[in-house]
């Protein structure tokens, strides 16, 4: 009788999916990674929209955020899931490690004030493809050898779908009704965002730190599985570390001198080009195909957040915590002098 575990045997196997037990499992991992990126993207859009709605001078930016189509988000989700499915765990692990090193270097060099907050938000926007790769690497490593791997991934996909739909529903609610509800003190969700939206980047930062920590551990473990001796591992990790360090130094200087979307595209080309040259010497031929897929995935994610990247370049954005107006209390009336008539 036809059953779910026999389904992958009818599907063609892809050599690039070497750490996945089947194409179905790799597809599930790609969908989970894309849904994780959807949650991050939706919450960032909520934060930016609230910041624009609280500032009357940001009305054009607010209308740009509101004008984005939901159908394009669905296409973006499907395309990202496809890239994460076919990229391969080895290249995904390299992408995660490269971004983690760049993120640590950027966070250590951040300044204080609004400029540091804008750079932190920009880092959150640029980590989307790397986050998807980190989630797929973590799932591939944690579910390796599990007796019910496909069932576990299906349950994880269900949870990720609930989180993604909830984040998208919150984004739509805020875009449609936040201004009305926050002005009339009507909705608890909108009032919570009015008072505490400034803390949303900190919450996202903690969640991303946990996700990338798990992804980095899984990436190192997955890469080390290919090496039989310590000398082979050293021949791989030594040029990789040197290449990553030089890339980080170059990209930080380039972004500070030429901020903007064009600079981010050039940074992606330099990153993927450096990994391509590195894997020509210590990698495999299929890894080179994965680098090309990663290049398309990075550019795909940049296209989806170009509006938010433009907002990060605006001076004094994000704005500080908006003042919450308190209802005016009536002034105490002056005591009236009562004249007592003599009886």
UniProtKB/Swiss-Prot annotation:
Name the membrane topology term. Multi-pass membrane protein
The annotated region (Disordered) lies at: 320-343
TM stretches of this protein = 30-50, 77-97, 121-141, 145-167, 203-223, 233-252, 263-283, 285-305
Sorted alphabetically, which Pfam families does this protein's record hold? Answer: TMEM82
Task: Quote the biased-composition stretches of kind Low complexity, using this chain's numbering.
Answer: 334-343
Give me the stretches of Pro residues compositional bias.
320-333
Q: Which UniProt keywords apply?
A: Membrane, Transmembrane, Transmembrane helix
InterPro entries named among the record's database cross-references: TMEM82
The record's principal subcellular location, in a coarse class, is membrane
Name the family the entry cites.
Belongs to the TMEM82 family.
What is the protein name for this chain? Transmembrane protein 82
